[in-house]
Swiss-Prot record:
Induction conditions: By glycerol. Not subjected to glucose catabolite repression.
GO molecular function: ATP binding; glycerol kinase activity
Taxonomic lineage of the native organism: Archaea, Methanobacteriati, Methanobacteriota, Stenosarchaea group, Halobacteria
Residue positions binding ATP: T14, T15, T278, G322, G422
GO BP annotations, alphabetical order: glycerol catabolic process; glycerol-3-phosphate metabolic process
Enzyme nomenclature, EC number: 2.7.1.30
A Pfam family reported for this protein in Swiss-Prot or TrEMBL: FGGY_C
InterPro entries assigned: ATPase_NBD (IPR043129), Carb_kinase_FGGY (IPR000577), Carb_kinase_FGGY_CS (IPR018483), FGGY_C (IPR018485), FGGY_N (IPR018484), Glycerol_kin (IPR005999)
UniProt xrefs under HAMAP family: Glycerol_kin
Protein name, per record: Glycerol kinase
Amino acid sequence: MSGETYVGAIDQGTTGTRFMVFDHDGKVVANAYEKHEQIYPEPGWVEHDANEIWDNTKQVIDAALSSAGLDAEQLEAIGITNQRETTLVWDRETGQPIHNAIVWQDRRTTDRIETLEAEGKTDDVRAKTGLEPDAYFSATKAEWLLDNSDPIKLQRSRPEDIRDRAADGELAFGTIDTWLIYNLTGNHITDVTNASRTMLFNIHDMEWDDELLDEFNVPRELLPEVRPSSDDDYYGTTDADGFLGAEVPVAGALGDQQAALFGQTCFDAGDAKNTYGTGSFMLMNTGDEAVMSEHGLLTTVGFQRSGEPVQYALEGSIFITGAAIEWLEDMTLIDNAAESEKLARSVESTDGVYFVPAFTGLGAPHWDQRARGTIVGMTRGTRREHIVRATLESIAFQTRDVAEAMESDSEIDLSSLRVDGGAVKNNFLCQLQSNILDTEIVRPQVDETTALGAAYAAGLAVGYWETLDELRENWQVDREFAPKDPQNVEHRYGRWKEAVDRSLDWAREE
């Protein structure tokens, strides 16, 4: 492969880190993956070790390049995509985090959001950020870190108030993209898509919002510079004396769901995709208009290229989909994710069983932080096959909840939906989704479109690809699933909504 050049993408996800290398045709030429530990200090709390994530990032880059016989000099650029909202704060001098990263799934700041609601401030937050105020986003996580991190972890002679150090500019806040850009280039930068998920960023003015910073007591000195998702000026370059041994431009970054939108070439208003990962996230490009939702969806930044207007998106965030399959493994109902398809096919129906996987509350369009996982309709005749099938159906039903809200807000009927993510390898799920949505499901040949989107953003910035049309030509269909065999879909969907109602407000304090 000597002489050829490529673009690399770091895909830092909830459960692990991947590095992929793509050629001009958008084909994968190298790929490596490493899991990291999920840390659960208390019920409802989820943390990651940011140093472990950085170590794994270096490992997968080395492993991918080695496996394909590539040198770092053959990379024209690196793009980054990441689990969004996950939040950390680190010491600028030592580069060490002051606490584990607080993961997007973490619910420790639920009470803070309820205080915001009680004070009547949610409408203002929603108007500025496009987000439904929730512990999911970064603002309350950053506030918690500044209030609760152990100052001894700063490894200074004066273990004093972290807030003082933050105000003095000695600490840095970031989502995972910022952490990786910092470690790769030494620069403190985020992109517009990740900034839009912090609940501190005004998506209309496209800047950090002073009123929100005051509300959550986050000093501006803590914050990164906000740059386009595809940046002709680059975020910086890797160090020739560092682990890569080459100066490679780091030129693109997008939150994982926006990266998938970009990788699916959803460049025009009305284009939509659904990504099935730990959670599921449906995004529809709304062009240069920030369409504010009246049906429980989020309005967010889709992407921005250098010198061009911001492209916005409507988003339906479903917290638990693929993680429900992992739960089946944890409960030893299946040995691996692939077995779920076989078991689901082995029964004609769920036999009246409905599973609402609200392990961390419910996202769009319900937004109930105190909803909890619920299985209804079981009898003595219920078998594991029924529960497995009900789990897959829950993914499709939750997606329909979001799709109906999206059609109402956008006034666009979904005639086709592009899908990606690990779960779309499951043909049963794709067909089930088509039936329940009564919509064509289109699966691309490259299903890891999140990494591809990050590569496209970086590659466009350095001229590896010149136009969006080149990227559209790269997009190839693997399989299309047309609706068939509805099996009382409307009745089943009605029963699903009843099951959701049973799950709501369960974890309330007596």
